[in-house]
Amino acid sequence: MEKRTNYCGELNETHIDQHVVLHGWVQKRRDLGGLIFIDLRDREGIVQVVFNPEFSKEALEIADSVRNEFVVTIKGKVHARGEKAINEKLATGKVEILAEEITILNTSKTPPFYIEDGVNVSDELRLKYRYLDLRRPEMNNIFKMRHTVTRTFRNKLDALGFFDIETPYLTKSTPEGARDYLVPSRVYPGNFYALPQSPQILKQLLMTAGFDKYYQIVRCFRDEDLRGDRQPEFTQIDLETSFLTKEKIQAITEDMLIDVVKEAKGITIEKPFPRMTYKEAMDRFGSDKPDIRFGLELQNVSEVVKDVDFKVFQSAIENGGEVKAINAKAAAANFSRKDLDALGIFVSNYGAKGLAWLKVEAGELKGPIAKFFPEEKALELKAALKAEDGDLLLFAADKADIVAASLGALRNKLGKDLNLINEDELAFLWVTDWPLFEYDEEAGRYVSAHHPFTLPKEEDIPLLETDSSKVMAEAYDIVLNGYEIGGGSLRIYKKEVQESMFRALGFTDESAKEQFGFLMDALEYGTPPHGGIALGLDRIVMILAGRNNLRDTIAFPKTGSAVDPLTNAPGEVSDAQLDELKLQITKKELN
């Protein structure tokens, strides 16, 4: 096989009159009055190849037998297209190849879908034939970008003196939030390894070991309910440092992300990134990962409406809740009564009992609850919300967390529905000053807001033993366009603080030792102050590539039900394998 001289997509006017050898796939073949045209595709793009009997009758005869997705080698000469033949849609559109030889390296069955961008095909079929789906230029470009992003992270961290150190995939199951993927041990029947949800504890032990600056581009595994921006296995840019403040860790993170965006998108991002406390984010946006590319901020109107004779508002306030509103400027005409009823159903999915609304018309409030607002109170409400003619006012009244969840989700929906979001903008945001614990309604207790190794604010450490719900954390999340792309914190590095943390989480001293004894031992051997962050590589690429689903950024992903249609994983194993592992399936659910 002759060595390739160029990739198809690299050819341009500077190559005119050069002889080239190209390898690739037949994207399209056209027979036009004795001439055959082939669009030849490789990972860098497409170039047109012309087969003319005046140049090679033999090549023309072979070209007549090729079909889409045949793999071929073509030798020929780069030629300038005529002015009327230029194809502005192709990067190579000003040139073509005059074919001298063609060799068919392999044939292809007719693919189950066209290998081209914009093809209308189900996700299930795309994943079943993922190797064909990945041939499409738009998919190919995503993985070029992923390579660029990964390379840029590596180069930056290397330049900053970080060591790339691998941590094991077969480790101990510890309670970190989601369910573990378990791997049975053949050598120790009845015992299991766990695939890591993150390298959290191990990277902290690397700080105890004195490596000072660690990073790893690492695969993580979580057996949790899936959604569009989650997969059971995913990749993190994981880093940890000793003796640095959280501000310095944030600065390093900003520098990395600025370099990544510049390399991947050619866009310059200013620093420092804006910062917002967790409380402010929840108050203003109803979300701990707010999209700050548009307004529609939540406004607390409890003081304004506490005296109005509307029982929904009164009851919420009397029971310790609140009333908040969104002013959708100039949007009243966009929503009929039916549309507003649909919004009420939408917020009910987030726990809200309903959605009250008002429109401002000719200076007056109009709508089902307008009668509860006498003139003076109506003026007060309009002033509080800066409401003008044409505005749509939307209200939720309930416990603070339900109001935040429902209006926060509604805000995001309205931002999209009203076309308020600049899709080309990249809006980074730090969310800081997190509570150390959050209440889990299902479990009926407080759990770690991040993980059990997060350092409490120094002044709050005594509260671990008395009122843990009030403890604040040295934690920081980074958000991009409404997605959490990373979470970090300073870590607990003293044994007595870690013991208090475990007690606050409901561990007995015995259970803490059983689960985390190796970490507790390490904390007795001079562990330095340390902290770090983990960034979601798949999610970062998803946003930069303008996609809506993590599946598009992972070469061989799972479906929303954690199934791989390509390999049919997960699958059954033989009785012999189960016997080797001393395992027995006690119940099999039939679908």
UniProtKB/Swiss-Prot annotation:
Q: Which GO terms describe its biological process?
A: aspartyl-tRNA aminoacylation
Principal EC category: ligase
CDD domains reported for this sequence: AspRS_core, EcAspRS_like_N
EC number from the UniProt entry: 6.1.1.12
Q: One Pfam match, by short name?
A: tRNA_anti-codon
Q: Where is this region: Aspartate?
A: 200-203
Q: Which residues bind L-aspartate?
A: 176, 222, 450, 491
Please tell me one Gene Ontology term that the record gives under cellular component.
cytoplasm
- List UniProt keywords, sorted A-Z: Aminoacyl-tRNA synthetase, ATP-binding, Cytoplasm, Ligase, Nucleotide-binding, Protein biosynthesis
The entry sums up its family as follows: Belongs to the class-II aminoacyl-tRNA synthetase family. Type 1 subfamily.
What job does this protein perform? Answer: Catalyzes the attachment of L-aspartate to tRNA(Asp) in a two-step reaction: L-aspartate is first activated by ATP to form Asp-AMP and then transferred to the acceptor end of tRNA(Asp).
How the protein assembles, per its UniProt entry?
Answer: Homodimer.
Q: What is this protein called?
A: Aspartate--tRNA ligase
Source organism of the structure: Listeria welshimeri serovar 6b (strain ATCC 35897 / DSM 20650 / CCUG 15529 / CIP 8149 / NCTC 11857 / SLCC 5334 / V8)
Name the gene that codes for it: aspS
